[in-house]
Amino acid sequence: MRIRTIGLFIGAALVVGCAGTPGPGDAGYPYNVDGDYSGSFTVDGLTFTGTMQISTQPGGAVTGTLSLNRPVQINGTIDGTLTGDQLTVGIKYGSNPATGCSGGTVEGALTISEHGASISGPVTVVDCGEMLDATINFSR
């Protein structure tokens, strides 16, 4: 009986020890970003509005799409990494009717609110070879 009790105790300790705290992409992680977000992207005094559809994969990889629709249509793909409450993001977009350029990039470190309700922060845009400071502010 004593050996059985010790075995049950060790088994319970292993289960508790292996459960651990969820990491990026795991169910229950407080900063996962998943779903549809709407908001603004402000660059050089011009505010664009639109949507992002994103998801966090196991290990913290983040993928998705960006669709800005006002004042012009710009579409891009999102790739990033979630660490803690920070999303290091890279966005590649196609044609920009506002500048006439055939595409550009956006990079930055965004802050995620708890439960992934909002995504915001400064980014750098490279469009037509010019670097511009910008701000992203999206929420569910």
Name the predicted role of every residue range.
Residues 11-13:
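Repetitive helical segments and hydrophobic/amphipathic motifs
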Residues 1-8:
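Bacterial N-terminal signal peptides that target proteins for export
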